[in-house]
Amino acid sequence: MSDVDAAVDLAAALGDIDTATPLVNSVTNNVTVNDVANITLHWGGLPVMSDDAREVDDMVATADGCLINMGTVDEDGEESMVVAGTAANEGDKPLVVDPVGVGATPTRTRVANRLLDELDVTILNGNHGEITALAGDDADVRGVESVGEYADIAETALSCARTHDTVVVASGETDIVASPEEAYEITAGHPLMAQIVGTGCMLGVTLATFAAGMENATPLDAALAGTVGFGLAGEKAAEEGEYNGPASYKTAFLDTVAGLEAAPDDPAGRIERVLSVT
């Protein structure tokens, strides 16, 4: 069994999560909070959404993993994110950071850089534009959406991973997962996923749930398994679910995640190592 095969044994990963039932605290935005909570539950985790700086450190201390999502950032929320992330680091809990909209405004860029400077981030999750902005390159981010074209996103994600010493997931038409040593391209998903507000938010907590629930998994293992599982669930929902458009497709997607017990396709066949640092 290759390293990639082992990392993307989706049935084993889902079994681990089902056994562990990891509690994941999400400090997330008020636009997609319900979707983030539901998909945590559907993967087999337990969601909690504490975001008050007065208690979030105590909640994260009892949790198995933590997501910080910058979707709706304000002064109080910024402090809660730092408190939550610090508690995750102190408890050696997996920490996923989703720097939503970084590069769109100076405030978001400052907050994202503060989180990366002050916290030990397990997995950094963003779209192509956000990851490009954090790598210090020119990015086209409009609001919280990536609207540019990023032909060199694998190189950019690898550079970002090396700069911030973390695992990077750069989501888009093709997804890139990069550690400081190597980058993988993942081909999985469906165009309808891009028509749902909050897909990236749901991916972020998916990564946190996999990182918290998979037994003996490295951050790269969790990022690969979570990203390819998320994409394959999107494909399965499109092919087998009942829907009439984006809204009903989202329901079909969540139903598919809830019922997923094994990969509907060969996960390793969807992953290609595209860069390696020797």
UniProtKB/Swiss-Prot annotation:
MF terms in GO: ATP binding; hydroxyethylthiazole kinase activity; magnesium ion binding
Organism expressing this protein natively: Natronomonas pharaonis (strain ATCC 35678 / DSM 2160 / CIP 103997 / JCM 8858 / NBRC 14720 / NCIMB 2260 / Gabara)
Binding site for ATP: N125, S171
EC number of the protein: 2.7.1.50
Catalysis performed (reactions): 5-(2-hydroxyethyl)-4-methylthiazole + ATP = 4-methyl-5-(2-phosphooxyethyl)-thiazole + ADP + H(+)
InterPro entries: Hyethyz_kinase, Ribokinase-like
Annotated coiled-coil segments of the chain: none
Name of the protein in question: Hydroxyethylthiazole kinase
UniProt gene name: thiM
Family, per entry: Belongs to the Thz kinase family.
Lineage of the species this protein comes from: Archaea, Methanobacteriati, Methanobacteriota, Stenosarchaea group, Halobacteria
